[in-house]
From Swiss-Prot:
Gene3D superfamilies: Bira Bifunctional Protein, Domain 2, GAD-like domain, Nucleic acid-binding proteins
Region (Aspartate): 199-202
Subcellular localization(s) per the UniProt record: Cytoplasm
GO BP annotations listed: aspartyl-tRNA aminoacylation
Protein name: Aspartate--tRNA ligase
Tagged with keyword Endoplasmic reticulum: no
Length: 589
């Protein structure tokens, strides 16, 4: 085989008359009455190669090649005639006149066409993932992913950060999701866990005095999957010592600006918008709001207190909430049947109903309009900024149901009404989170983020009297309605960390067994430290305009956490189980 001289994207009319050697895959072959044309594909693009009967040996071989054959061609770059120019490809003004053809390898007929547009099932694509990855759109996504990680590394190293790898085989600790467990052959009956995050190790690196750490970290969580979750994923993990929260946010803003400029050619203004957790929930019904469009939630308790509409008045009297969204100018777009469908939709999120009113020239119109006297209607219209042609939708329930149902409805309406500018990247910090979440079902508190998050110093006394009122020095970075990542200032005193464990239901013995190494480390001069981690897979998904996390992971798992290509997970031999002192309980498939 000859040495390849050029890739497809390196060919242009400036090379007219030059001899080149190209290698790649046959995308398409066409026989046009003597002349044979082959579209040769490599990872950079497609080049048209023409075979003339005058070059008999190469022409005869070209007649036999089929799609996805791997070939090598030698030939001369020539200009296409004016009527043959293809404006849809970068090198569409030239073609290569072949003088030699070598078939490096043949190929079976592929189970689907290797083209960007394919309507085959995702399962078939995942089974033949190595073929799916040949599609240019997939290569472009992974080229972008590589560019993102390169930019991140360069930025952080220039900022003085050290890239440090932390263990993959580690100790099982309660961090929220279930651990993936790895049995130890050497220590019978004992297990390692795959890390859900490098959280404890990166804090210990701050104890060690490293001050600035980062890692492109592999993480594992055995949890129920959805479109934007995978059992194994990659996060950009960062930890620093001696920085304030504002300094951490500012540094990460500059990191994101660098990525957006390098990878997308977009200048993102900073500082990013900041919004406290409670404000986000009040205005958007979500802790990760998409702020590219309006449709904000409006609180109406004061409007409906003691009003003639008993459903709303009773809700207010019970200490619950009534909120509304004004769908501007949508009265003509939603029929009664459409509103019934929206009512079913909010029911998924616990709402018992969706009340609605249309604003007409004659006043309010809809199923509940008869309960609104002139004064109440005027007060509502003023509060909602309503005009003729608007629809007002209402949910009345406890705060969590109102937020969940109207927050989800807001997102649906934004999509259905085409209100979202898909070209926009709206970054947002959500700050001042609650430190704890209380589970009525379990009758206990859980950490809203993780057990190592630092409370506001002025809220520490509330840990003994009103834990639900304690605010966390935590921050999430949100992009276009997706939680991109999050971080916090950390606890760095042993007594405060022990108090945190106590409130989370750990006995002193349990805390020592699970986290004794961390508690002891906190007795050896620990600096204040803070950090952040964001999901690389999700970041690339959003930058690439993809809608599925699996499209940004080379060999992903399905929604059932299986690999259709390798058929993992799979059974192992009795001998392997015996070595690990394991036995499988009988079960039904």
């Amino acid at each position: 085989m000859a040495t390849r001289t050029h890739a497809s994207n390196e060919l242009s009319e400036t090379l007219q008359g030059e001899k080149v050697v190209l290698k790649g895959w046959v995308q398409r072959r066409r026989d046009l009455g003597g002349l044979i044309f082959i579209d040769l594909r490599d990872r950079t693009g497609i080049t048209q190669v023409v075979f003339s009967p005058d070059v008999a040996e190469a022409h005869a071989l070209a007649d036999k090649v089929r799609s996805e054959y791997v070939i090598e061609i030698e030939g001369t770059v020539i200009l296409r005639t004016e009527d043959q120019i293809n404006p849809n490809v970068p090198n569409g003004k030239i073609e290569v006149e072949a003088t030699r053809l070598v078939v490096i390898n043949t190929a079976k007929t592929t189970p689907f066409q290797i083209e960007d547009r394919t309507d085959v099932s995702e399962d078939l694509r995942l089974k033949y993932r190595y073929l799916d990855l040949r599609r240019p759109v997939m290569f472009d996504t992974f080229k972008m992913r590589s560019d993102v990680t390169r930019t991140i590394r360069n930025f952080l190293q220039n900022e003085g950060f050290l890239e440090v790898e932390t263990p993959i085989l580690t100790k099982s600790t309660p961090e929220g999701a279930r651990d993936y467990l790895v049995p130890s052959r050497v220590h019978e009956g004992e297990f390692y866990a795959l890390p859900q995050s490098p959280q404890l190790f990166k804090q210990l690196l701050m104890v060690a005095g490293f001050e600035k750490y980062f890692q492109i970290a592999r993480c594992f969580r055995d949890e129920d999957l959805r479109a934007d979750r995978q059992p194994e994923f990659t996060q950009v993990d960062i930890e620093t010592s001696f920085l304030t929260q504002e300094e951490v946010l500012e540094m990460n803003e500059r990191l994101i600006q660098a990525v957006m400029k390098e990878v997308k050619g977009i200048d993102i203004p900073a500082p990013f918008q900041r919004m406290k957790y409670q404000e986000a929930m009040d205005r958007y019904g979500s802790d990760k709001p998409d702020v590219r469009f309006g449709l904000e939630l409006v609180a109406l308790n004061d409007v409906f207190e003691g009003c003639g509409f008993k459903v709303f008045a009773d809700t207010v009297a019970q200490g619950k909430q009534v909120k509304s969204i004004n769908i501007k100018g949508a009265a003509d777009k939603y029929s009664r049947k459409d509103m019934d469908e929206l009512t079913k939709f909010v029911g998924i999120y616990g709402a018992k109903g969706l009340a609605w009113l249309k604003v007409t020239e004659e006043g309010l119109n809809g199923p509940i309009a008869k309960f609104f006297d002139e004064a109440l209607a005027a007060a509502l219209i003023e509060r909602m900024g309503a005009e003729v042609g608007d629809i007002l939708v209402f949910v009345a329930d406890k705060a969590s149901v109102v937020a969940a149902s109207l927050g989800a409805l807001r997102t649906k309406l934004g999509q259905d009404l085409d209100l979202i500018d898909e070209s926009q990247f709206a970054f947002l910090w959500i700050t001042d989170w609650p430190l704890f979440e209380y589970s009525e079902e379990d009758g206990r508190y859980y950490a809203a983020h993780h057990p190592f998050t630092r409370p506001f110093d002025e809220d520490i006394p509330l840990m003994d009297t009103d834990p639900s009122a304690v605010r966390a020095q935590a921050y999430d970075i949100v992009l276009n309605g997706y939680e991109l990542g999050g971080g916090s200032l950390r606890i760095y005193e042993r007594d405060l960390q022990e108090k945190m464990f106590e409130l989370l239901g750990f006995s002193e013995e349990e805390a020592q067994a699970q986290f004794g190494f961390l508690l002891e480390a906190f007795e050896y001069g620990v600096p204040p430290h803070a950090g952040l981690a964001f999901g690389l897979d999700r970041f690339v998904m959003l930058l690439a305009g993809r809608h599925n996390l699996r499209d940004t992971i080379a060999f992903p798992k399905t929604a059932s956490a299986s690999c259709l290509m390798t058929e993992a997970p799979s059974e192992v031999s009795p001998e392997q189980l015996s070595e690990l002192s394991l036995a499988i309980k009988p079960f039904r498939k």
